[in-house]
Amino acid sequence: MSWLLDSDVLSQPAKKIGDARVIRWIEKHQQQCYTSSIVIAQLAFWVRTKRGKQRVALQKWLTELVEAMRGRILGFNVSAAHVWADLQYQLQTTGKPMPVEDSYIAAIARRHNLTVATGNVKDFQRPGIKVFDPFAET
C-alpha cells in the first residue's frame, strides 16, 4: 500500500513536540510515502509564519524534505484536475463541501490510487477517498 501524506502528518518530525507514533509510522513506511505540491505549499506557508531561528530551522527542514522526497511529490496536473472536477461535483450535489486545498489533495490521491494519511479523516472520507489516520495508531 502507498500513502499520500497530508501536511499534518508530514510536519510531525519538524515540530518541537511531534507525535512519536506518527514519526515512527513515517519512518517505517517512508519508501511507500508520497506527498503533493499542495502539501508542500501548505508547509512552505507554515514556515513563513515563523520567525527567527525557528523559521531558519524549518526552512532548512523543508528544503531537505523536498530533496528527500524527490520523485514522490505529485503535482496537480490535467488528469488530477479532471478528477477534482468530478469530486467537486459530487460534493456540491450532496451539499457536503470540502476545503479547496484538501479537495486538490484528495483528487491527487484518487488519481494515483493512494490512501491519504491524515488526522483530518472526516474531510477526506466525504468524497470516498481512502484514508488512514496515523495519529490513531497504537
Language-model region placement:
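Acidic, PIN/NYN-like endoribonuclease modules and their adjacent C-terminal/linker elements
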Residues: 1-2, 106, 110-138
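Short, well-structured N-terminal submotif of metal-dependent ribonuclease cores
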Residues: 1-35, 47-64, 138
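Generic structural signal for small/hydrophobic residues in well-ordered secondary structure
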Residues: 6-7, 22, 43, 84, ...
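Alpha-helix capping/helix-boundary segments
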Residues: 9-10, 39, 80, 105, ...
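Residues that scaffold the ATP/ADP-binding catalytic core of kinase and kinase-like folds
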Residues: 12-13, 43-46, 84-87, 127, ...
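Residues at secondary-structure transition points
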Residues: 17-20, 34, 38, 53, ...
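Short, structured coil segments at secondary-structure junctions
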Residues: 29, 69, 127-128
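Active-site neighborhoods of divalent-metal-dependent phosphate/nucleic-acid chemistry enzymes
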Residues: 45-48, 71-119
